[in-house]
Amino acid sequence: MLKSFKTEINPTIEQKIKINKTIGTCRYVYNFYLGHNKTLYDNGEKFMTGKSFSVWLNNEYIPNNPDKIWIKEAYSKAVKKSIEDGCTAFTRFFKHQSAFPNFKKKGKSDVKMYFVKNNTKDCRCERHRLNIPTLGWVRIKEKGYIPTTKDGWKIKSGTVSVKADRYYVSVLVEIPDVKIANNSNGGIGIDLGLKDLAIVSNGKTYKNINKSTRIKKLEKKLRREQRCLSRKYENLKKGESTQKNIQKQKLKVQRLHHKIDNIRTDYINKSIAEIVKTKPSYITIENLNVSGMMKNRHLSKAVASQKFYEFRTKLKAKCDENGIELRVVDRWYPSSKICHCCGAIKKDFKLSDRIFRCDCGYVEDRDFNAALNLRDALTYEVA
């Protein structure tokens, strides 16, 4: 069984320079691969795969262009991984699974430094530090979070990333499969929404964290800092500001974005952990059409803030870890319109109606009624 662990690291100045150089090289090679294939397509030539491009880059392009020799200075496995990512992006585009790959812009795109275990000395982990290829020993801020290799845990691979001037490492650890006893409790249904994050059929409701005072204050501060950044760009055109001041202000904005994102992620993690601790035999959720909801300009911001996809992904991981069956009901299943008492479908039930009232006399909150119907749904797919 493979499990990932992500935590913040505290690299030295020399290690930070190496990380930034490697990430910059990976971004350049990724963009170069995209641009090269775009040129081949415009000229009517055959598409070049990631493996063919890697051979051409190392054996033909760099030897014939001495000014690009700095590409060789970066960690080779990280550069090769960036080419593979570009090839994957093109493959998804050809299968009509995503749009045409975009070029990664410096400071705005999420580029990571990939590393893999090459020998027995690489990827060793102790309680307070981790050995990363080309970087050496790097100190971990959260001591004891990553399983140590002294206890028999094996680190297969990992990535180093930078967000808002903070450095993180994510490692993939091979852990033994644990035999989990069957959960004797009944199943539960979870209805996700915008008013509240999750309404559970056992009566528990997880509020929308974005409506809390803490998030609202941070978003207000973020808008203020973004206006300040916008003014600095305007002053730069007039010659009244400098790039250094803009970089400082951009870092302030990035840190606020990162802080808000961490609060939302932490709330999702704690909510899922609390749900799983009840040890249900199964959990049923609805397959929401998030991409369709994002097209509504009045709802897109609220939908993105709730992070429905992350909730489902992490819930599945926790269910797999604890031996709980995760059931997914079709998006067209009328969970909100079905009376949980008599089973009648109320076709004229509107989104503005918050209370479900049936002719049989059953009265209940629409979201809780939907959670009960999801729990008792008979048509589903196992995630």
What is the meaning of each model-derived region?
Residues K3, I17, T148-D151, K163-A383:
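Positively charged, helix-rich recognition surfaces that bind polyanionic ligands
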Residues S52-R166:
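Acidic carboxylate diad motif detector
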Residues Y30-N37, Y41, F90-Q97, D196, ...:
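A generic secondary-structure signal for well-formed alpha-helical elements
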Residues Y33, A78, S82-F93, R366-L378, ...:
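Stable alpha-helical structural segments in soluble proteins, enriched in small hydrophobic residues
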Residues S4-E8, W137, S157, G187:
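Well-ordered beta-strand positions in beta-sheet-rich domains
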Residues M1-K80:
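Gly/serine-rich nucleotide phosphate-binding loop at the start of the catalytic core
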Residues K6-E8, D85, R129, Y168-S170, ...:
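Beta-strand secondary-structure signal
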